[in-house]
A protein has these predicted regions:
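Long, ordered, helix-rich scaffold segments
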Residues: 2-204
């Protein structure tokens, strides 16, 4: 009674550092991004899809839309159940990571522009989610637990995304987070986005 072809999640719970080449379609990667319940595999397929979008040549076949829609669908539930994984799924690989996958004709300015462009698209595609997500991650007394570390990590990412998308009031969130921080992670996260986005109070 299987009505559609199954999508294979490979090397689940496999601890050895293995690189396996498998011909995933973009739709397969997006499906696993949304529904995979193995955290590492979910992160890995997300990185595979992002790298495919960023590193494709002029004959571009991978559309950012399938990635953006998958993240938008997966993020609310994941933010509530595993904040650290949610934060990591919003990561866009840094330019040096992307460079390691390019074996010829490396153009650092082009790679940088493509990365920043996808980050901007992601921030704007989920613009309506950032305010609610930030409210769901309230600042509390410092706690050194996996859940608390995940909350802090996701809050910093959401704050940067909100500022990137010009969400109303996000500059005030940054100032409040800086003023009320209970640890260096919160304070530095707020200061970093204030400087990167050239907020008026960044030098205060």
């Amino acid at each position: 009674n299987v009505v559609s072809e199954p999508v294979v999640s490979l090397l689940r719970d496999f601890s050895a550092p293995v690189q396996l080449n498998y011909d995933y379609q973009d739709e397969d990667l997006a499906f696993l991004l949304k529904y995979e319940n193995n955290g590492f595999n979910r992160w890995q397929v997300t990185q595979m899809l992002v790298n495919r979008i960023l590193l494709q040549g002029q004959d571009a076949k991978s559309s950012p839309e399938i990635y953006l829609q998958a993240v938008a669908q997966a993020l609310p539930e994941l933010a509530a159940s595993d904040a650290m994984l949610a934060a990591r799924l919003l990561d866009i690989p840094l330019a040096p990571e992307l460079a390691s996958a390019i074996h010829k004709d490396y153009d650092p300015e082009l790679v940088k522009a493509q990365r920043e462009g996808l980050y901007q698209q992601l921030a704007e595609a989920l613009k309506d989610q950032w305010s609610e997500l930030y409210k769901q991650l309230p600042m509390q007394a410092y706690e050194d637990s996996a859940a608390a570390r995940g909350t802090r990590a996701l809050r910093n990412v959401v704050l940067d995304m909100a500022l990137t998308a010009n969400v109303a009031g996000a500059d005030e969130w940054a100032q409040q987070q800086y003023d009320n921080a209970s640890c260096m992670t919160e304070r530095f996260g707020a200061l970093k986005v204030m400087v990167n986005h050239q907020l008026a109070n960044a030098d205060a």
